Amino acid sequence: PTSQRLKNYRKGQPDYYLEELYYQFGRYLLIASSRPGNMPANLQGIWHNNVDGPWRVDYHNNINIQMNYWPACSTNLNECMLPLVDFIRTLVKPGEKTTQSYFGARGWTASISGNIFGFTTPLESQDMSWNFNPMAGPWLATHIWEYYDYTRDLKFLKETGYDLIKSSADFTVDYLWHKPDGTYTAAPSTSPEHGPIDQGATFVHAVVREILLDAIEASKVLGVDKKERKQWEHVLAHLAPYKIGRYGQLME
Protein backbone atom coordinates (compact mmCIF):
# COMPACT_ATOMS: atom_id res chain seq x y z
CA PRO A 1 0.00 0.00 0.00
CA THR A 2 1.00 3.61 -0.54
CA SER A 3 1.21 4.29 3.21
CA GLN A 4 3.86 1.59 3.60
CA ARG A 5 5.74 2.78 0.55
CA LEU A 6 5.83 6.27 2.08
CA LYS A 7 7.27 4.89 5.31
CA ASN A 8 9.92 3.00 3.37
CA TYR A 9 10.72 6.07 1.28
CA ARG A 10 11.22 8.19 4.39
CA LYS A 11 13.73 5.62 5.59
CA GLY A 12 15.73 6.08 2.42
CA GLN A 13 14.42 3.21 0.31
CA PRO A 14 14.24 4.27 -3.37
CA ASP A 15 10.82 4.05 -4.98
CA TYR A 16 10.69 5.56 -8.44
CA TYR A 17 7.09 4.49 -8.95
CA LEU A 18 6.08 6.39 -5.82
CA GLU A 19 7.77 9.48 -7.19
CA GLU A 20 5.85 9.04 -10.44
CA LEU A 21 2.62 8.60 -8.47
CA TYR A 22 3.17 11.91 -6.69
CA TYR A 23 4.07 13.57 -9.97
CA GLN A 24 0.76 12.47 -11.47
CA PHE A 25 -1.06 13.38 -8.25
CA GLY A 26 0.27 16.93 -8.60
CA ARG A 27 -1.02 17.07 -12.17
CA TYR A 28 -4.39 15.77 -10.98
CA LEU A 29 -4.68 18.52 -8.36
CA LEU A 30 -4.11 21.22 -10.97
CA ILE A 31 -6.44 19.56 -13.49
CA ALA A 32 -9.17 19.39 -10.85
CA SER A 33 -8.80 22.98 -9.63
CA SER A 34 -7.88 24.97 -12.74
CA ARG A 35 -9.96 24.51 -15.86
CA PRO A 36 -10.70 27.02 -18.65
CA GLY A 37 -13.56 29.34 -17.79
CA ASN A 38 -13.07 29.05 -14.03
CA MET A 39 -10.97 30.85 -11.44
CA PRO A 40 -7.35 29.75 -10.98
CA ALA A 41 -6.22 27.52 -8.15
CA ASN A 42 -6.01 29.48 -4.90
CA LEU A 43 -4.18 28.76 -1.66
CA GLN A 44 -6.26 25.66 -0.96
CA GLY A 45 -7.18 24.71 -4.50
CA ILE A 46 -10.80 23.58 -4.14
CA TRP A 47 -10.28 21.55 -0.99
CA HIS A 48 -10.59 22.71 2.61
CA ASN A 49 -12.85 21.76 5.50
CA ASN A 50 -14.03 25.20 6.62
CA VAL A 51 -16.57 27.72 5.41
CA ASP A 52 -13.84 30.36 5.55
CA GLY A 53 -10.49 28.74 4.81
CA PRO A 54 -7.01 29.79 5.95
CA TRP A 55 -5.92 33.23 4.71
CA ARG A 56 -9.44 33.70 3.33
CA VAL A 57 -8.55 31.24 0.57
CA ASP A 58 -7.15 34.16 -1.42
CA TYR A 59 -4.40 34.41 -4.01
CA HIS A 60 -0.95 35.02 -2.55
CA ASN A 61 1.09 36.62 -5.31
CA ASN A 62 4.44 36.38 -3.55
CA ILE A 63 5.04 32.76 -4.57
CA ASN A 64 1.97 30.63 -3.84
CA ILE A 65 -0.07 31.16 -6.99
CA GLN A 66 3.10 31.07 -9.09
CA MET A 67 4.11 27.79 -7.47
CA ASN A 68 0.71 26.30 -8.25
CA TYR A 69 1.39 26.85 -11.94
CA TRP A 70 5.07 26.02 -12.24
CA PRO A 71 4.24 22.50 -13.45
CA ALA A 72 1.37 23.50 -15.74
CA CYS A 73 3.04 23.93 -19.10
CA SER A 74 6.07 21.77 -18.34
CA THR A 75 3.80 18.77 -17.67
CA ASN A 76 1.67 19.31 -20.80
CA LEU A 77 -1.25 21.02 -19.05
CA ASN A 78 -1.28 24.21 -21.09
CA GLU A 79 -5.06 24.53 -20.87
CA CYS A 80 -4.82 24.57 -17.07
CA MET A 81 -2.77 27.77 -17.34
CA LEU A 82 -5.67 29.67 -18.95
CA PRO A 83 -7.51 30.49 -15.69
CA LEU A 84 -4.31 32.14 -14.43
CA VAL A 85 -3.99 34.09 -17.68
CA ASP A 86 -7.59 35.30 -17.35
CA PHE A 87 -7.02 36.20 -13.70
CA ILE A 88 -3.95 38.26 -14.56
CA ARG A 89 -5.92 40.11 -17.22
CA THR A 90 -8.45 41.20 -14.58
CA LEU A 91 -5.66 42.74 -12.51
CA VAL A 92 -4.47 45.15 -15.19
CA LYS A 93 -7.02 47.96 -14.79
CA PRO A 94 -6.95 48.08 -10.98
CA GLY A 95 -3.21 47.45 -11.14
CA GLU A 96 -2.77 50.58 -13.26
CA LYS A 97 -4.46 52.62 -10.55
CA THR A 98 -2.13 51.08 -7.99
CA THR A 99 1.02 51.98 -9.92
CA GLN A 100 -0.20 55.52 -10.49
CA SER A 101 -1.33 56.23 -6.93
CA TYR A 102 1.46 54.43 -5.06
CA PHE A 103 4.45 54.94 -7.34
CA GLY A 104 3.58 57.54 -9.98
CA ALA A 105 4.53 54.95 -12.58
CA ARG A 106 3.26 53.59 -15.85
CA GLY A 107 1.95 50.09 -16.36
CA TRP A 108 0.28 47.80 -13.86
CA THR A 109 1.24 45.72 -10.87
CA ALA A 110 -0.22 43.73 -7.98
CA SER A 111 0.78 43.19 -4.38
CA ILE A 112 1.12 40.28 -2.00
CA SER A 113 -2.56 39.37 -1.76
CA GLY A 114 -5.24 39.17 -4.44
CA ASN A 115 -8.85 38.11 -4.78
CA ILE A 116 -11.61 37.67 -7.35
CA PHE A 117 -12.46 41.39 -7.17
CA GLY A 118 -9.20 42.72 -8.61
CA PHE A 119 -7.46 43.70 -5.37
CA THR A 120 -3.93 44.92 -6.20
CA THR A 121 -2.77 47.18 -3.33
CA PRO A 122 -0.82 46.32 -0.18
CA LEU A 123 -2.99 45.23 2.71
CA GLU A 124 -4.16 47.98 5.04
CA SER A 125 -2.48 48.39 8.46
CA GLN A 126 -0.05 45.50 7.97
CA ASP A 127 3.71 45.22 8.41
CA MET A 128 5.40 46.37 5.21
CA SER A 129 8.36 44.04 5.77
CA TRP A 130 6.17 41.29 4.29
CA ASN A 131 3.21 43.23 2.91
CA PHE A 132 5.16 45.41 0.47
CA ASN A 133 5.75 43.54 -2.77
CA PRO A 134 5.36 45.68 -5.91
CA MET A 135 7.14 43.07 -8.04
CA ALA A 136 4.28 40.61 -7.56
CA GLY A 137 2.71 41.96 -10.75
CA PRO A 138 5.79 41.50 -12.95
CA TRP A 139 6.29 38.04 -11.47
CA LEU A 140 2.75 37.12 -12.49
CA ALA A 141 3.35 38.58 -15.94
CA THR A 142 6.25 36.21 -16.55
CA HIS A 143 3.67 33.41 -16.67
CA ILE A 144 2.13 35.09 -19.71
CA TRP A 145 5.36 34.68 -21.63
CA GLU A 146 5.75 31.14 -20.31
CA TYR A 147 2.36 30.22 -21.73
CA TYR A 148 3.36 31.60 -25.12
CA ASP A 149 6.80 30.01 -24.93
CA TYR A 150 5.26 26.54 -24.59
CA THR A 151 2.30 26.95 -26.92
CA ARG A 152 3.84 29.25 -29.56
CA ASP A 153 0.37 30.71 -29.93
CA LEU A 154 1.25 33.83 -31.91
CA LYS A 155 -2.35 35.05 -31.94
CA PHE A 156 -2.43 34.90 -28.15
CA LEU A 157 0.82 36.83 -27.86
CA LYS A 158 -0.32 39.49 -30.31
CA GLU A 159 -3.88 39.97 -29.05
CA THR A 160 -3.51 39.30 -25.33
CA GLY A 161 -0.08 38.48 -23.99
CA TYR A 162 2.17 41.21 -25.29
CA ASP A 163 0.26 44.16 -23.87
CA LEU A 164 0.28 42.56 -20.42
CA ILE A 165 4.02 41.92 -20.60
CA LYS A 166 4.89 45.34 -22.04
CA SER A 167 2.83 47.19 -19.45
CA SER A 168 4.48 45.20 -16.68
CA ALA A 169 7.95 45.93 -18.07
CA ASP A 170 7.10 49.64 -18.26
CA PHE A 171 6.18 49.63 -14.58
CA THR A 172 9.41 47.83 -13.73
CA VAL A 173 11.52 50.43 -15.54
CA ASP A 174 9.71 53.29 -13.83
CA TYR A 175 10.07 51.68 -10.42
CA LEU A 176 13.83 51.23 -10.58
CA TRP A 177 16.23 53.80 -9.12
CA HIS A 178 19.01 54.98 -11.45
CA LYS A 179 21.96 55.20 -9.09
CA PRO A 180 24.80 57.73 -9.41
CA ASP A 181 27.15 54.90 -10.46
CA GLY A 182 25.01 54.29 -13.55
CA THR A 183 23.38 51.06 -12.41
CA TYR A 184 19.70 50.45 -11.75
CA THR A 185 18.36 48.96 -8.56
CA ALA A 186 14.98 48.41 -6.93
CA ALA A 187 14.42 50.69 -3.97
CA PRO A 188 12.70 50.06 -1.72
CA SER A 189 12.56 46.30 -2.04
CA THR A 190 12.12 43.22 0.11
CA SER A 191 12.53 39.48 -0.10
CA PRO A 192 9.01 38.09 0.34
CA GLU A 193 8.09 37.69 3.99
CA HIS A 194 11.75 37.64 4.98
CA GLY A 195 13.78 40.50 6.35
CA PRO A 196 13.58 44.28 6.36
CA ILE A 197 12.94 46.74 3.56
CA ASP A 198 16.16 47.66 1.75
CA GLN A 199 17.35 48.18 -1.81
CA GLY A 200 18.38 45.67 -4.43
CA ALA A 201 16.84 42.49 -3.02
CA THR A 202 17.95 39.51 -5.09
CA PHE A 203 14.37 38.30 -5.55
CA VAL A 204 13.32 41.66 -6.96
CA HIS A 205 16.27 41.88 -9.35
CA ALA A 206 15.57 38.33 -10.53
CA VAL A 207 11.97 39.25 -11.37
CA VAL A 208 13.12 42.47 -13.07
CA ARG A 209 15.55 40.53 -15.23
CA GLU A 210 12.97 37.95 -16.19
CA ILE A 211 10.18 40.36 -17.14
CA LEU A 212 12.56 42.56 -19.15
CA LEU A 213 13.92 39.52 -21.00
CA ASP A 214 10.35 38.40 -21.70
CA ALA A 215 9.36 41.85 -22.99
CA ILE A 216 12.45 42.03 -25.20
CA GLU A 217 11.81 38.61 -26.72
CA ALA A 218 8.09 39.26 -27.18
CA SER A 219 8.74 42.54 -28.99
CA LYS A 220 11.22 40.78 -31.27
CA VAL A 221 8.74 38.02 -32.08
CA LEU A 222 6.07 40.56 -33.02
CA GLY A 223 8.50 43.05 -34.57
CA VAL A 224 7.17 45.98 -32.54
CA ASP A 225 8.29 48.67 -30.08
CA LYS A 226 11.95 48.92 -31.07
CA LYS A 227 12.36 52.13 -29.05
CA GLU A 228 10.99 50.56 -25.88
CA ARG A 229 13.05 47.44 -26.52
CA LYS A 230 16.25 49.50 -26.55
CA GLN A 231 15.29 50.99 -23.20
CA TRP A 232 14.58 47.55 -21.73
CA GLU A 233 17.91 46.28 -23.06
CA HIS A 234 19.72 49.29 -21.60
CA VAL A 235 18.19 48.82 -18.16
CA LEU A 236 18.85 45.08 -18.27
CA ALA A 237 22.50 45.64 -19.18
CA HIS A 238 22.96 48.11 -16.32
CA LEU A 239 20.96 46.36 -13.62
CA ALA A 240 22.99 46.11 -10.41
CA PRO A 241 24.61 42.66 -10.16
CA TYR A 242 23.74 40.05 -7.59
CA LYS A 243 25.83 40.21 -4.43
CA ILE A 244 27.94 37.31 -3.21
CA GLY A 245 28.62 36.92 0.51
CA ARG A 246 31.88 36.02 2.21
CA TYR A 247 30.95 32.34 2.24
CA GLY A 248 30.27 32.32 -1.49
CA GLN A 249 26.52 32.43 -0.99
CA LEU A 250 24.08 34.45 -3.06
CA MET A 251 22.99 37.22 -0.72
CA GLU A 252 19.27 37.73 -0.31
Kindly label every feature range from the protein language model.
Residues 1-59, 78-99, 223:
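Acidic/polar, glycine-enriched structural segments that form the non-catalytic walls/loops
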Residues 16-20, 158-163:
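Alpha-helical scaffolds flanking conserved acidic
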Residues 12, 19, 31-32, 68, ...:
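Alpha-helix C-terminal capping/termination sites
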Residues 42-59, 106-159, 167-234:
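The feature captures the catalytic groove of carbohydrate-active enzymes
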Residues 18, 57-82, 91-100, 194-252:
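Extended ligand-binding clefts on enzyme/binding-domain cores
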